[in-house]
Amino acid sequence: MVGLKPSDVPPTMAVKFLGAGTAACFADLVTFPLDTAKVRLQIQGENQAVQTARLVQYRGVLGTILTMVRTEGPCSPYNGLVAGLQRQMSFASIRIGLYDSVKQVYTPKGADNSSLTTRILAGCTTGAMAVTCAQPTDVVKVRFQASIHLGPSRSDRKYSGTMDAYRTIAREEGVRGLWKGTLPNIMRNAIVNCAEVVTYDILKEKLLDYHLLTDNFPCHFVSAFGAGFCATVVASPVDVVKTRYMNSPPGQYFSPLDCMIKMVAQEGPTAFYKGFTPSFLRLGSWNVVMFVTYEQLKRALMKVQMLRESPF
């Protein structure tokens, strides 16, 4: 990322991986209820949810969370958290931790700065690579977030836990079931990574170049918030298709394209922006928490590295 002084020790690959994964997990802990609310709003209106929808209707972000707490218990907004943390450790560490390295690969030799095209290519590449590794965890996370359990009984729960979900999906739908929705997810995360990481990179660079802010919390906050807004605007349509397709039972949709066509036919084009508000609240707050934490972790780990190399 931009903003490091020449005298600073550049972070190693291990520092970037650990810092990005840890910061993303912390951000998930803070914002996970917003993500769950987004998933519930995105799948509301599907054919398979009609019967349940007669009992439960979600209205707005806060209303969705309060309805879940009232009907399913206080822990329900955190359904799928374990899979979510597994996802971030394997996902964010790649898409964010590898971004600088891939950007350097695409940057022509002798160039002082990376162009916008170079940054977009790097964002698309690391986003797609991350999905390849983390897709099963994303499928399980979405299944848990989408499942509705009315009452305290566990008898209506399809999965008893995260590991049981992996086993059950593989047994009932085949190993391919764990990779369901990989194509729309690659599209979604390539777009999100470009809008998120590239926007953060450019905003931070410009704020520092024009001396509007120093390389500290306010700069990181503004850059991260702008990145979250851009990511939400461009990724919401793909995100809705991804969520519905991954949550669907076998046979409901033939492909992500079929899912998209049925959405337009049954609910109109506005269905692509269902759950936009929680998506923005979640991505905006997630980006702020993640990037601020990531910058501080990198700074702390680099100081430790400098002390090790020159203890006196």
From Swiss-Prot:
Sorted UniProt keywords: Diabetes mellitus, Disease variant, Membrane, Mitochondrion, Mitochondrion inner membrane, Obesity, Repeat, Transmembrane, Transmembrane helix, Transport
Q: What does this protein do?
A: Putative transmembrane transporter that plays a role in mitochondrial metabolism via an as yet unclear mechanism. Originally, this mitochondrial protein was thought to act as a proton transmembrane transporter from the mitochondrial intermembrane space into the matrix, causing proton leaks through the inner mitochondrial membrane, thereby uncoupling mitochondrial membrane potential generation from ATP synthesis.
What broad taxonomic lineage does this protein's source fall under? Eukaryota, Metazoa, Chordata, Craniata, Vertebrata
Q: Which residues lie on this side of the membrane: Mitochondrial matrix?
A: 33-76, 137-183, 238-271
According to its UniProt record, where is this protein mainly located? Answer: mitochondrion
Organism of origin: Homo sapiens (Human)
Q: State the oligomer form and interacting partners.
A: Interacts with HAX1; the interaction is direct and calcium-dependent.
Membrane topology value: Multi-pass membrane protein
Q: Name one GO biological process term.
A: respiratory gaseous exchange by respiratory system
Which protein are we looking at?
Putative mitochondrial transporter UCP3
Question: Any ranges marked Mitochondrial intermembrane in the topology annotation, and which?
Answer: 1-10, 100-119, 201-217, 295-312
Q: Which gene encodes it?
A: UCP3
Q: How is its activity regulated?
A: The proton transporter activity is activated by fatty acids (in vitro). The proton transporter activity is inhibited by ATP and ADP (in vitro). The effect of Ubiquinone/coenzyme Q10 on the proton transporter activity in reconstituted membranes is unclear (in vitro).
Explain what the record says happens when changing residue 70 to W: In severe obesity with type 2 diabetes
- At which residues are the Solcar repeats? 11-105, 114-206, 215-300
Against Pfam families, the record matches this protein to: Mito_carr
